């Protein structure tokens, strides 16, 4: 447990967590629900995201305009997000606004009014259309379905137009009743707010939530070596490469963070330097890590013109292979560790970051470590740890590749250039 953090479990099973920061004006508040797109049946894909939207349409105590006007008066934006495994609401308000802010957030989570379903469904359909016009985002959805085929964890978080268009109030109410239960909710706060006061406010605001049976998630089954191409009349081809990663409580996550930083996490990373700075082949290139309950995803993404595609992917394949072989450059492992530790401390200057870490870790059952312990774990990562993880996660034939662009022949040629150093049938 981190110093200064207190956690209380209410009779409903709801957990209240806080970190006292008396030296700031604002209190960061968040409500986290253990439900996301991974928990949806195929016919209602997108229901978690639509429900998140609908929470803003009003509750039994606060209509939509009252919610909007209150947070405008607070000088705050009430935000929400849906991921594959969680849904959250969050805001940052002054101390005097905490009671009303929590009352509104509690009412949204526990007693939504399910108003204006048709209108909000149209908003989400417009969001999906916008997303479909953004190929550098859309390519990750194509990759997800390659890596986790025919599984909820691989489907787009927001669903698709056909399933979202069929969602009605009955489906939304059923999803809320099944998943918005006390023991699936965490309320977190960071700032000048005493824990006992927060607990009392949450008990009043989130009343009506009761414990419910926990719904087990089927274990994800990752595929390997698959490819997909979507033809679009674009100037660039957008590429996403991905493979199966590790779960969010795996002790190797610290080594994976170092590996990700070395490969494509910053301005001195291999992908950025070799593909963009040295060769000028891309505007954007990066690696990424995503954690789920028992598994995860690792990968990289870039966009470039067809004539540059084979060279760019060939360089990426070479860098992945070199890391898996333990060919490190002078100082890069230590530099990556220094970066991670510095970013940890800089991020923790933010009450929003502290609140988010509390809520996210508790709702997903990740141990709450002190900043000192996290830094110690990062310091303990060795070159061998990074090499072994790279060799495992980027093993021959393990990676799936998705592309969106104008020229499938150029895509296939680039896959050949990528496969040559990496090996396998990616």
PLM feature segments, named:
Residues 267:
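Short Ser/Thr-interspersed hydrophobic loop/turn segments at strand-loop and sheet-helix junctions
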Residues 5, 9, 17-20, 64-220, ...:
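Charge-rich, well-structured scaffold segments of protease-associated domains
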């Amino acid at each position: 447990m981190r110093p200064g953090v207190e956690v209380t479990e209410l009779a409903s099973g709801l957990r209240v967590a806080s970190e006292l920061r008396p030296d700031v004006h604002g209190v960061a508040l968040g409500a986290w629900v253990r439900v996301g797109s991974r928990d949806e049946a195929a016919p209602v894909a997108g229901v978690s995201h639509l429900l998140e939207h609908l929470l803003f349409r009003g509750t039994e105590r606060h209509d939509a305009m009252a919610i909007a006007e209150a947070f405008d008066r607070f000088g705050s934006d009430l935000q929400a997000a849906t991921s594959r495994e969680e849904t959250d609401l969050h805001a940052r308000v002054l101390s005097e606004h905490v009671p009303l802010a929590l009352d509104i957030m509690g009412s949204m989570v526990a007693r939504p009014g399910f108003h204006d379903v048709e209108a909000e469904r149209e908003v989400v359909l417009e969001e999906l259309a916008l997303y479909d016009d953004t190929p550098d985002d859309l390519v990750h959805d194509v990759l997800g379905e390659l890596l986790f085929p025919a599984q909820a964890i691989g489907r787009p978080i927001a669903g698709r137009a056909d399933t979202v268009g069929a969602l009605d109030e009955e489906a939304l109410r059923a999803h809320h009743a099944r998943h918005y239960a006390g023991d699936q909710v965490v309320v977190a706060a960071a700032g000048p707010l005493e824990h006992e006061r927060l607990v009392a406010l949450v008990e009043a605001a989130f009343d009506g939530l009761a414990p419910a049976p926990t719904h087990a998630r089927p274990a994800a089954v990752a595929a390997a070596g698959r490819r997909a191409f979507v033809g679009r009349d674009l100037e660039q081809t957008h590429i996403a490469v991905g493979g199966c990663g590790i779960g969010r409580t795996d002790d190797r996550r610290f080594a994976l963070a170092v590996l990700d930083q070395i490969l494509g996490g910053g301005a001195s990373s291999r992908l950025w330097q070799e593909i963009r700075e040295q060769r000028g082949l891309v505007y954007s290139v990066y690696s990424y890590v995503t954690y789920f309950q028992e598994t995860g995803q690792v990968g990289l993404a870039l966009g470039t013109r067809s004539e540059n595609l084979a060279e760019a992917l060939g360089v990426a394949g070479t860098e992945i292979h070199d890391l898996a072989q333990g060919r490190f450059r002078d100082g890069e492992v230590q530099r990556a560790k220094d970066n991670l530790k510095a970013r940890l401390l800089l991020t923790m200057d933010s009450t929003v970051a502290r609140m988010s870490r509390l809520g996210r870790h508790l709702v997903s059952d990740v141990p709450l470590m002190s900043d000192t312990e996290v830094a110690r774990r990062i310091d303990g990562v060795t070159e061998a740890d990074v090499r072994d993880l790279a060799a495992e996660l980027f093993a021959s034939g393990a990676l799936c590749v998705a592309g969106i662009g104008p020229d499938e022949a150029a895509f296939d040629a680039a896959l050949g250039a990528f496969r040559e150093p990496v090996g396998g049938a990616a």
